[in-house]
Structure formats: structure tokens, C-alpha cells
């Protein structure tokens, strides 16, 4: 029996020194490494099979290589091993699988070169000194000298704010416990004995390194291709992806999607690799790196290994892995696309459901429209049948209105969209003409207003009304009024007399809110105004007994500015009639007074100045002033025109024709030893003849003040003063009283004007509007650049004194008093401004 199989290596080969032969028996190793491209090619020699571990090795074996064997250390003691049977392939595979798992590695597994060599005399030699692998002393007594010092370091740290038990740093972010060291079990390199992390490191940094995780996953995946060495059937761990996870991811790979049509037939030459490759679409380029290149050298796929003898890595099937991964990706993309298609179909169902509802609503609406149109057509045909002459039950206007009301209320949409013009022309117009056949508008102006108002709401086009149009072809009501109602009005206007205006005015007032605006304008412009213009041309103010305003003014609310062309001939005729007029004739005032508010202010003032004021001046010039026997008729004739002529024109007449004679008579009277009481009464009597508006005029005020000055000078002179005791005081009191009244009136008027300006928002801003007379004076001073300020420490009768420019004044109950030569004199605000300038 051959014992060669006892010395056969794991590869099933027996090597000799000169010749080598290979046993052709199939072993487990052959089956396992059948597809392994990285299996070892070394054959066992005959010497190795004979002498076993005592076989001499060639120098080639001792050179550095990527293998897991190491050179023997002959300085180490001799360790005898039993000459047992060589392990079979299955047992060796079990050992290799067990090596893949993490296990504590013994120190003997590594070369002795990692630690310092020690002299050993035998297998049982024991060193006399125990220590750590590096030959260093124990760290147990490190820093023991600190126990014999005074702890200056601790004290310095405490002075700098260190709190025992807390970390260093401003925010105590330093570590509290010192870094914990872990003693390595043997003399191997770092990582040879597994993880060297301490308990403190696991607590402070619980996160596992990503490289360690990747290595663990790789080892687990690699071990799935090998048989479990323990013989137990361990279930492999699989990573599953649920459909929900794929839906959440929801991304479709661009590599797996169908290429675009325009890029699917493009020829591409790839020269980036070792050899030229031709692709027939861009989509193929995206897949070129998924399949590994064939023929890669074995050395490029092997990683250098050091340490113990490396075992053969598990063989890889990249094509199989690629195909499996491609199937997985295609399945995932199919799931995602199916989910999207399902969602699309669901949305389409919802959309179609809504469209079905809309179409159902449209269908119902169309059915209702068809039904309504059928009913409307029946009603129209009924009206047409009853409009026939031989019908026993003819249609009346009220019944027709009710039919149209039914159409408008129940079938509004169809009625609004229908051609109401043609329908009204065919049905309503004949009935309306029959209704107004015997109508006289001037006798019964309200006839038909109710029925026309009803038809207005039925026939008028709201859209046309909002645009203000007058298209007869688009609005049935406008056409009805123009073709049916308007002919009756034309016939009446041709027979109407303009002087009898009331019936026509009442008629148009009754219909103004019913008929369209453009029809009313046509009536006024084309029918009424020509009749009035012709009648004005025939009017004679001297012979006609009926005043012209009695038949012109009633048209003002309706025609307004349309009557402007009539005013010029009316003024011309009135001016001709006033050429021989005398102010004693009051009829002229009665004729002209109604026109004052009709004519414009400019034209009215020009008419008065041209025709009335000269006549009044002549009358006032004929007035004789006699204190003993006064005739006031001429004065009354002139004053009676106040309000008709302007105040300025009236004051001009008084200044020219009245006050010179009046002052002359006063001077003559004072020079003849008069009775001052009679003069006072005469003065007050003439002053009472004028209105407050005339007295407030500065010219009239100056004339009366001049009369007071004449009276004061007369009583102040020695001549005749002794003849009447108390006359001087009476005249002075009269002067003071009159001037005070004038100034109070002036102040009140100015204050009222200031308040009106404030209310209208005209002038100064609201914040600067004067609230009292002092503020008004201050505002006027600012406007005229005049200094207005109080005099410090100066008062008169308890009133504060002020400087207004160069003048000293004080204010008492809304009246300004100016300091004169001997006394304080009241004055107006305008006079104060003039004196200050």
C-alpha cells in the first residue's frame, strides 16, 4: 500500500527533485477550486514529502513574496511534533474558514522579529524577569513622585479657574478622565489581535468606523460562498427592500431607461480602453463599466499580504454578479414604473370621473335648454295665432305684457339670448299703435306711462344701456319709443303755442324718466327750441302784456344751457325798451328781476351799467337836500335798485351825486349856530337810510367819518360853542360810538371771512388758521412782513400793548385801538396795515 497520500499537500501533488508527477485522482480540493483562477500553482517536491518540516528550503523560498509563509527562526528552541497524518482538504478548509472569523490570535502565530530576541537555551527555558512586550517597565508606579511634592500644578490650575471634577477650558469642554490605555496581548502589530478600543472609547465614540463595517460586510458576503466549518447549516442573512422603500425612493435609473429615438442609432467609437470598441448607441456607453474587462493580470487582482501565510481568496464571478445585479435593478425599476403607472391610472380614473360628472351636468343643462326653448316657442306661436285678424280671442297689450313677463321670469336666459327686437316688432308694436291711437299728450300727459314703464323693463337692453348706445336695431324699447311713441309727440309739438308752455312742460316732466335720453334731447333740440326761438324773435316788451320770463323760465330745468342763444336777443330787446324809461317806473324792475339769476354775472352787470345806472344817476342828481323840508322820493327810487345793481355801482352813484351835496348842506348848517341835537338826529337819520352792506363799504364809511370830523371841528371851535352847553361832549360821544360800531362790524366781518376761508380750506393751512382776532392780526402781519410783538411791562386799562410796525396798539373785544395824539382811536385791520406800511 502506498503512503504517498500521507505526504501529499493540499493540492494533491507529489514533487521529486528531478522529475515531478501529478496524481490524477480528484480530491475535494480539486472540486472546491475548480473555478478558482487564483489557486496556488506550487507543487510539493519529493524532499518535502519525505522529510516533511525538516526538508531544506531553497533560497527562492526565503525571498520576500506575497505568500503567507515566513522564514524559520533557527535560534528558537526545538519543538517536536508528532508525525501524524496530513490533514485532508476538508479539515484544512475548516481551518481556513475558522481563520476568517475574528478570534484571539496567539503570539506564536506571528514572527519573532516583532519583539526583541532573547537567548533561549532550551524548550523549557523561562526568563527570570517578566515584563511587557516592548521590554518597558510597568506603568503602575508612574508619577508616584507626585505624592512627595506640594502639588503646585493643582494649585496653579485652581488659581486659573479650574474646578476639580470638571473638564478644562472656558466652557469645561475638556475631558475629565485621562485617556485610558489598553495593553496589547502579544507582540504582534497594531490590529493583529482584533479591536483595541477601550471601554472609555466605546462610551465616548460609540459610532463604528465605516471601514470596519465595510470589512465585516465583505467577510460575511465572502463566507456565504464557503461551507460552514462547524457543519451547522447557518442561514445566510439577506438584505430585503420592500415595495414601500422602492416607492419612497422613486428614482428610475437613467442607465436602464429606454434611450431617446434620435440617439438610439448613433455609432460611437470608444478608444479610452486598451483596445478600440464600437458602440451603436449612447446608452451602451453607460453600461460599459458594469462588466469588468477580461484578461486582467492576476497580479493586479492580488493585494500584498504580510504576516502569516495567506490563504487562497475566494474566487469571484463578475459576470454572474453583474447579471444578478442587473436583474435586481431591472426588477426595482419595473416595480417603480408599475407603481407610477398604477398611480397614473388611478388619477386618470378620478379625472374621467370628474369629466363624466361635468358632461352629465352639461347634458342636463342642454336638456333643460331644449325643454325651455320648446316652451318659449309654444308661447310665441300662441301669440302669433292670437294676432291673426280672424281670431276670436285677440291678444291685448296687458296679456302680451304678462306673456313677456313670464318669459323674463321663468326663461330669462333664453329670453335674454333671443332676438327681442324682432319679437317685439312682430307682436308688441301693432298693439302699442292701437293703444296710443286716440291719445292727446297735452290733455292727458300721464296716459300710457305705466304701460310704457312696464315694457321698458321687459324690452330694454341692459348691455346697450350701460354702454350708452342708441342702436335701434339692438334695443327693442328704443325702437318702440322712436317708431310708435315719437310720431304722436311730433304732431302735438307742431300744433303747440310756446306761450302756453305749462302743458308741454308737464308732459315732458312726466315722461323724462321713461323715454331714453337721446330721444328727450331730440325733442328739446329739434322740436321745442326752434319754436321758442321763433317766439322770442316775435316778442315785443313794450306791447306784450305777458312777461317773457313767464314762458321761458319754466324750460330752465329741462333745457338749462340750451336757452343761452335766446338770452342775447332778449337783452337786446329789453335794452331798447329801457331807452325812455324813468326810475319812477317800477315795472322795469319787475321785468328785469327774474333775469338776474338767469344771466351770467358779467352779462347782468354790463346790462345794468349800460341801461339802469345812468338813469339812476340822473335821478339822484335831481335830489334836493333840505334839512327843514326834505323830499325823499328820488332817493327811494335809487335805493330801491339795491340788490339789482352791484354795491360798487351804487356807491359810485352816491359818491358822485349824493355825498357832495350832503356834506355841503351839513357845513352850511353848522356855520349858522345850529342845534346840535337836530344835526345829530339828521346825521343818524340819513345813515339809517342805507343798508349795512352799503355802510360797510370803505368809501361810504369815509364820507360819514368825514361828516363826524366836520361836526367835531365845529364844536371844538370857540364860535358858537357857548350857545349850547354839552354839545361838544355829545358830538364826541356820537363820534366815538359810531366809529366803535363801524370797527366792530369790520372786525366781525373780517373774522367771519377768516372762518369761511378756514372752512373752505382756502388760504393758509388748517394749522395756521386764526382762531381769534389776535391770531388774525398776527397772520396779516406775517403776510405783509410787519413786526407784531407785545410791549413788555406796558398795559392800558389792563390790556396788553403791542407794536405793529411803528404803531402801538391794543385789542379790546375784537377791536383794534391805535394810539393817537391824545387818545386811543379804533381802526380797521386794513387801515392798520396801511398805517404800518
Curated annotation (Swiss-Prot):
Basic and acidic residues bias spans: 1-13, 53-64, 103-116
GO molecular function, one term: nucleic acid binding
Residues the record lists as Phosphoserine modifications: 2, 59, 98, 144, 210
Pfam families cross-referenced by the UniProt entry: G-patch, GCFC, TIP_N
Region (Required for nuclear speckle localization): 710-734
A GO BP entry: spliceosomal complex disassembly
Motif (Nuclear localization signal): 700-705
Main subcellular localisation: cytoplasm
Keywords linked to the UniProt accession: Biomineralization, Cytoplasm, mRNA processing, mRNA splicing, Nucleus, Phosphoprotein, Spliceosome
Role played: Involved in pre-mRNA splicing, specifically in spliceosome disassembly during late-stage splicing events. Intron turnover seems to proceed through reactions in two lariat-intron associated complexes termed Intron Large (IL) and Intron Small (IS). In cooperation with DHX15 seems to mediate the transition of the U2, U5 and U6 snRNP-containing IL complex to the snRNP-free IS complex leading to efficient debranching and turnover of excised introns. May play a role in the differentiation of ameloblasts and odontoblasts or in the forming of the enamel extracellular matrix.
Protein family per UniProt: Belongs to the TFP11/STIP family.
Oligomeric and partner information: Identified in the spliceosome C complex. Found in the Intron Large (IL) complex, a post-mRNA release spliceosomal complex containing the excised intron, U2, U5 and U6 snRNPs, and splicing factors. Interacts with TUFT1. Interacts with DHX15; indicative for a recruitment of DHX15 to the IL complex. Interacts with GCFC2.
Protein name (Swiss-Prot/TrEMBL): Tuftelin-interacting protein 11
The organism of origin for this protein: Macaca fascicularis
GN (gene name): TFIP11
